[in-house]
Amino acid sequence: VSTDADANLGTTAVREGFAFDEAALADWMRSHVDGFAGPMQVAQFKGGQSNPTYRLKTPGKSYVLRRKPPGALLKGAHAVEREAKVLVGLEQANFPVAHVYGLCTDNAVIGSWFYVMDMVEGRIFWDATVPGVSRSERAAIFDAMNAAMAQLHGVDYQAVGLGDYGRPGNYFERQIARWSRQYCDDTDAGRDPNMDRLIAWLPANIPANDDATTITHGDFRIDNMIFHPTQPRVLAVLDWELSTLGHPGADFAYNAMMYRMPPAIVAGLAGADIAALGIPGEADYCAAYCARTGRAAMPAYDFYMAFNFFRLAAIFHGIKGRVIRGTASSAQAKERVAVLPELMALAWQQAVKAGA
């Protein structure tokens, strides 16, 4: 993987409909960003982020701007103010995130709310098998990812001003109800017997007396992390759009889904010779997280897995509905729809493993 963020994330000229008044932004930067000095060049990151993301390059340093999209928005979606809030809180806890310089809630500056943060330079590994590094470094990279997740779940969210960042408690109940409703309501995308079985099984099998609450990332994958250019060290965890107060076991199992996920669905390790690669096995990876977080074990781990596969299948099912309705036309969206039956079958397999 290139150590150059341009090659990893790829910038392009600002796309039509996403341009803004760069002079107005430069004025805001001068007032809010210590040490800012122009001139400033603006480029847009490629990729279909729901919040358009830009690189602001000056002779001295580069910054990243994330904004709400222009135009009418769904209530609660594109909440850049939540992203900025969690980043500020986590930086106070010395968790590896990009430094936020400021949040702007005045539409007059560039047309929508935005925040500006540091551009963190390093390596992003798009493939979970982490090609191009030595076996020992690969092991250390996985250990660093495991340690980062344990550190996140150990943050005292009240102490860093995130006590109101979500609803503590009943996480599984609320999430299962939400995704079940979304699946059932999207009649265009149809029904699947594996999903129907999960919708019946999951709420009846939520582990008792298991109501821990921590900050959860919601999409903790190796490709959402920036590693040091030459060391197996996490410099920043990216993409906090799905973060909330949630259940740490669910967040950890989402990360560990890579062990049970074929590479064709989402960056997965299923079928890879992980021992030859130097990647810890699933049981060892789980034990390392438990040791770091003071747990003797994770008895409900297979339930957490079933829940996460179900949640991901529900998200992909929603994409299928949008493809059918013609509101999601990207090649990536169509690829996700193609693997949906396999993903739903895999989700039910996790429930069987958990005793269904």
Model-flagged regions — what are they?
Residues L238-S243:
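Activation of the activation-loop gatekeeper triad in protein kinase-fold domains
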Residues S2-F36:
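Juxta-kinase regulatory segment immediately upstream of eukaryotic protein kinase catalytic domains
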